[in-house]
From Swiss-Prot:
GO cellular component, as recorded: mRNA capping enzyme complex
The species this protein was found in: Neurospora crassa (strain ATCC 24698 / 74-OR23-1A / CBS 708.71 / DSM 1257 / FGSC 987)
Family: Belongs to the eukaryotic GTase family.
GO MF: ATP binding; GTP binding; mRNA guanylyltransferase activity; RNA polymerase II C-terminal domain binding
Location in the cell: Nucleus
Keywords, in A-Z order: GTP-binding, mRNA capping, mRNA processing, Nucleotide-binding, Nucleotidyltransferase, Nucleus, Transferase
GO biological process: 7-methylguanosine mRNA capping; positive regulation of transcription by RNA polymerase II; tRNA processing
Protein's UniProt name: mRNA-capping enzyme subunit alpha
Catalytic activity field: a 5'-end diphospho-ribonucleoside in mRNA + GTP + H(+) = a 5'-end (5'-triphosphoguanosine)-ribonucleoside in mRNA + diphosphate
Active-site positions on this chain: K66
Length: 402
């Protein structure tokens, strides 16, 4: 049985729920959210394109840093005995049970009572603790709230209201708990923090202050529309910005090993005339996910460019001793426009969908640099101020006159 205490692996943050329990939990979450689907309900961003500069001028957006962690929904619920339990839900829709008594989320006016039917959106990261020679601590960084105490009306409220509910009803009572019982912190699975949000024109603040002060890796910015409701699945109003050269794609990798002719000596040793050479660098094909819309009803479509694997990289991959065939891999373009292996994405069931691939490729071809974002900030701010003034005037007109 796992003991309470900080998690050490953000990819395996607890005990994975067995299939039958996971199905039951998925149905619970769908019921709370009023959905017929039991699939992963989390919102997913689209890649930032040049057209989105106009979107930032036209609509109210918040901006935060894009953490290089793992996305989870935190589900606060009860077990069959009525005891407080929590699960982390990953993008594969697997449920990870946090060890009992490793977390507590008290109600605002009762430190013993706890939240249930509550779904929080965030990202799990490992922060490096300053002055500890590299010691890591897990943090759950919150950026949205889907449901509070079995009520999902929040889904239709704007982002600032959703975050306001999280702060008032969950985060402030949680912070008071830590202040009252600091001796319990070492036994907690992770610390919870609210992700710092700036108004969309606070881009310079993000680049100059927020990102340099982070204790974890960050690989871009996320812009989220203030006024739109929470959207299950791909949300066109959540914009993921990366510097054009840092854009990556998730593919399914398939390796084709060369056939070689046996030498005379190998034939004498009993080798067949031709055999597969698993030592040489294989041809690595990349495939994108297309649901059932691929060629001939296939789920996958061959990406036009292969994965380039250097000799030394192949030696490293072989030395891992792990299965390589058909794994999901995150790839980036190098200076010579070759796709290179960045990391394995075992946290994902599928490669990027063909629509995502098209979106990211457009971002790479027509990407917006950090300098262009900074230059756009002034116009974004001016437009925001004009909208804010109009809202203020409308509110004044609607007030009853005495």
């Amino acid at each position: 049985m796992e003991q309470p205490g900080p998690i050490t692996d953000i990819a395996k943050p607890g005990i994975k729920a067995p299939r039958d329990l996971a199905i039951s939990l998925r149905e619970e979450v769908a019921r709370i959210l009023g959905r017929s689907s039991i699939g992963f309900p989390g919102a997913q961003p689209v890649s930032f394109a040049r057209k989105h500069l106009e979107e930032l001028r036209r609509e109210d957006y918040y901006v935060c840093e894009k953490s290089d962690g793992i996305r989870y929904l935190l589900y606060l619920t009860v077990d069959e005995e009525g005891q407080e339990v929590q699960y982390l839900i990953d993008r594969k829709n697997d449920y990870w049970f946090l060890p009992r008594n490793s977390m507590h989320f008290p109600m605002p006016n009762d430190i013993q009572a706890f939240h249930r039917g509550t779904i929080i959106d965030g990202e799990l990261v490992m922060d490096t603790v300053p002055g500890t020679n590299g010691r890591k601590e897990p943090r759950f960084l919150v950026f949205d709230l889907l449901a509070l105490d079995d009520k999902a009306e929040l889904l239709n409220k704007p982002l600032d209201k959703r975050l306001g509910y999280f702060s008032a009803y969950i985060y402030e009572p949680y912070k008071k708990l830590l202040q009252q019982f600091p001796q319990e912190i070492p036994f907690m699975a992770f610390k919870v923090e609210m992700k710092r949000m700036e108004l969309s024109y606070g881009i310079e603040t993000m680049f100059r202050e927020v990102i340099p002060a982070l204790k974890h890796d960050s690989d871009g910015l996320i812009f989220t529309c203030r006024t739109t409701p929470y959207h299950f699945g791909t949300d066109p109003h959540i914009l993921k910005w990366k510097a054009p050269h840092e854009n990556t794609l998730d593919f399914r990798m398939r390796l084709n090993f060369p056939l070689v002719q046996a030498t005379e000596a190998e034939l004498d040793e009993g080798f067949p005339e031709q055999f597969t050479d698993y030592d040489s660098v294989p041809q690595a094909e990349l495939y994108v996910f297309c649901g059932n819309d691929g060629p001939g009803g296939s789920k996958y479509e061959l990406f036009p460019d292969p994965l380039y694997i250097a000799e030394d990289e192949w030696e490293t991959l072989k030395a891992l001793g792990d299965p390589l065939q058909d794994r999901v891999v995150e790839c980036c373009l190098d200076a010579e426009n070759r796709w290179r292996l960045f990391r394995f994405r075992d946290d994902k069931n599928e490669a990027n969908h063909t629509s995502t691939v098209s979106s990211v490729m457009a971002s790479i071809r027509d990407g917006v640099s950090d300098q262009e974002l900074l230059s756009a900030a002034t116009a974004i701010k001016e437009s925001w101020k004009i909208r804010a003034q109009k809202r203020k005037e409308q509110q004044q007109q609607q007030q009853p006159k005495h």
